[in-house]
């Protein structure tokens, strides 16, 4: 874990390993997808202000950069390992 500044806000930065190694003996390590959907589809602009969806987009982009996948297969493996979804590679050649 490390600290970094975002403007005037002090934030924590965790690795995926640190976040995934949480012990929840009673409830287990997984949560229902409903919780994710509640957060994802709530009125973010109401709570975070205009541009909230852009902030979420940038967070996702930074996550992708932090993961630093070397191959498409690395992305597929990550999505399967963390139960994000099933990825089907239709074409490996870019347009």
Swiss-Prot record:
Gene3D superfamilies documented for this protein: Trafficking protein particle complex subunit 3
Supply the InterPro entries for this chain: NO_sig/Golgi_transp_ligand-bd
Cross-referenced SUPFAM superfamilies: Ligand-binding domain in the NO signalling and Golgi transport
- The name under which this protein is listed is Uncharacterized protein MJ0716
**Native source organism of the sequence:** Methanocaldococcus jannaschii (strain ATCC 43067 / DSM 2661 / JAL-1 / JCM 10045 / NBRC 100440)
Origin organism lineage: Archaea, Methanobacteriati, Methanobacteriota, Methanomada group, Methanococci
